[in-house]
């Protein structure tokens, strides 16, 4: 359960876009931003922006401001204040302290090599050793082996992964993504998460966290991934090029085509606000591609 009470908002639709500041927004980021924006606005909901700056060694100086500037340039205006995870460490630590005190979490000193020797999944080796340093793992009492995706139906998680006691605070003192994102979504009243299909497996762990916290899980919608011509996911880690800030309308239209919109010719003559308004009015989940990976001509807007 939660160590203290979150201030819950109303149950009207609240979505969010939560990029990490490890580089500029690329075409794959735009897909996630647009999908979450259209899903929220088509339901007259709020669209929040949260900067997930949990991992300083991987962050690019100035990237957070550049991301926000890019969203504004593309007229993807968010509701409320931007939230930064780097300012919320107290929230994460309070929950971890509660779990440590209750015995729900424990320290682990197993190396990656040791876990590989276990078969690739952590087997709970340190659970009863009563260590006082290392990474912190959560005892998994609510494993999730499947969940319902709003577009793709039932999604399955490998049993070994679902049952694993996963890390909630790293050995280097950095907070783990799964814990932070769930606590933030609860705190911000998020009702639905729209994001890329590369996060399907973490979804199981996040639903487990909701249940262990005594909270109702959000709904999930996973969007197809934009791949480059070599079949690699467009990502900051793969050095994907930032999207063009000088021609946002054409980039928005290309991203909308990727998301399955049948774009009328006249929309190519419309301004940015008109394009986005049309997108909100014509957004349908059943138009999204069934494939979760799309290797096509899309590569940051270039053929």
UniProtKB/Swiss-Prot annotation:
<protein>
    <recommendedName>
        <fullName>Glutamyl-Q tRNA(Asp) synthetase</fullName>
        <ecNumber>6.1.1.-</ecNumber>
    </recommendedName>
</protein>
<dbReference type="InterPro" id="IPR020058">
    <property type="entry name" value="Glu/Gln-tRNA-synth_Ib_cat-dom"/>
</dbReference>
<dbReference type="GO" id="GO:0008270">
    <property type="term" value="F:zinc ion binding"/>
</dbReference>
<keyword id="KW-0030">Aminoacyl-tRNA synthetase</keyword>
<feature type="binding site">
    <location>
        <position position="126"/>
    </location>
    <ligand>
        <name>Zn(2+)</name>
    </ligand>
</feature>
<dbReference type="GO" id="GO:0006400">
    <property type="term" value="P:tRNA modification"/>
</dbReference>
<keyword id="KW-0479">Metal-binding</keyword>
<keyword id="KW-0067">ATP-binding</keyword>
<feature type="binding site">
    <location>
        <position position="110"/>
    </location>
    <ligand>
        <name>Zn(2+)</name>
    </ligand>
</feature>
<feature type="binding site">
    <location>
        <position position="122"/>
    </location>
    <ligand>
        <name>Zn(2+)</name>
    </ligand>
</feature>
<dbReference type="InterPro" id="IPR014729">
    <property type="entry name" value="Rossmann-like_a/b/a_fold"/>
</dbReference>
<comment type="function">
    <text>Catalyzes the tRNA-independent activation of glutamate in presence of ATP and the subsequent transfer of glutamate onto a tRNA(Asp). Glutamate is transferred on the 2-amino-5-(4,5-dihydroxy-2-cyclopenten-1-yl) moiety of the queuosine in the wobble position of the QUC anticodon.</text>
</comment>
<keyword id="KW-0547">Nucleotide-binding</keyword>
<feature type="binding site">
    <location>
        <position position="108"/>
    </location>
    <ligand>
        <name>Zn(2+)</name>
    </ligand>
</feature>
<dbReference type="GO" id="GO:0004818">
    <property type="term" value="F:glutamate-tRNA ligase activity"/>
</dbReference>
<dbReference type="InterPro" id="IPR049940">
    <property type="entry name" value="GluQ/Sye"/>
</dbReference>
<dbReference type="InterPro" id="IPR000924">
    <property type="entry name" value="Glu/Gln-tRNA-synth"/>
</dbReference>
<feature type="binding site">
    <location>
        <begin position="16"/>
        <end position="20"/>
    </location>
    <ligand>
        <name>L-glutamate</name>
    </ligand>
</feature>
<keyword id="KW-0862">Zinc</keyword>
<comment type="similarity">
    <text>Belongs to the class-I aminoacyl-tRNA synthetase family. GluQ subfamily.</text>
</comment>
<keyword id="KW-0436">Ligase</keyword>
<dbReference type="GO" id="GO:0006424">
    <property type="term" value="P:glutamyl-tRNA aminoacylation"/>
</dbReference>
<feature type="binding site">
    <location>
        <position position="177"/>
    </location>
    <ligand>
        <name>L-glutamate</name>
    </ligand>
</feature>
<feature type="short sequence motif" description="'HIGH' region">
    <location>
        <begin position="19"/>
        <end position="29"/>
    </location>
</feature>
<feature type="binding site">
    <location>
        <position position="195"/>
    </location>
    <ligand>
        <name>L-glutamate</name>
    </ligand>
</feature>
<feature type="binding site">
    <location>
        <position position="236"/>
    </location>
    <ligand>
        <name>ATP</name>
    </ligand>
</feature>
<dbReference type="GO" id="GO:0005524">
    <property type="term" value="F:ATP binding"/>
</dbReference>
<dbReference type="GO" id="GO:0005829">
    <property type="term" value="C:cytosol"/>
</dbReference>
<dbReference type="Pfam" id="PF00749">
    <property type="entry name" value="tRNA-synt_1c"/>
</dbReference>
<dbReference type="InterPro" id="IPR022380">
    <property type="entry name" value="Glu-Q_tRNA(Asp)_Synthase"/>
</dbReference>
<feature type="short sequence motif" description="'KMSKS' region">
    <location>
        <begin position="233"/>
        <end position="237"/>
    </location>
</feature>
<feature type="binding site">
    <location>
        <position position="52"/>
    </location>
    <ligand>
        <name>L-glutamate</name>
    </ligand>
</feature>
